[in-house]
Regions:
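A short, hydrophobic beta-strand element within the central beta-sheet of small alpha/beta folds
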Residues: 67, 72-81
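Active-site beta3 strand of CheY-like receiver
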Residues: 4, 46-52
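Receiver (REC) domain active-site loop signature in two-component systems and cognate sites
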Residues: 57
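Hydrophobic/aromatic residues located in beta-strands of well-ordered beta-sheets
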Residues: 4, 29-30, 74-75
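Helix N-cap/capping motif at the beta->alpha junctions
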Residues: 32-41, 62
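Two-component/phosphorelay signaling modules centered on CheY-like receiver
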Residues: 11-31
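Active-site residues of response regulator receiver
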Residues: 8, 54
Length: 81
């Protein structure tokens, strides 16, 4: 089972990702985050294998977030909704 988080500043994007992740039997949604700072908090407390990430977010962008990671999970970037 791969533990993953979804990071998107738009609620629709988070909801679509949640629906997709729940359909894949080997994925477990550990958290939905509205921004990169929330995702950083989740990563501090939980081991995450897979990250679904929006690139264009206010504040810390998706690319800046990736650069800040010390342990790199598998990353899936911007799904272009």
């Amino acid at each position: 089972m791969l533990r993953c988080i979804a990071v998107d500043d738009e609620l629709l994007g988070l909801d679509l990702l949640e629906d997709y992740i729940r359909q894949v039997p080997y994925l477990e949604l550990a958290a939905k985050c509205k921004n990169a700072l929330e995702a950083i908090d989740v990563l501090r407390n939980h081991p995450i294998d897979l990250l679904f990430l929006d690139i264009q977010m206010p504040g810390l962008t998706g690319l800046q977030f990736i650069q800040s990671l010390t342990r790199k999970p598998m990353i899936i970037i911007d799904y272009g909704l």
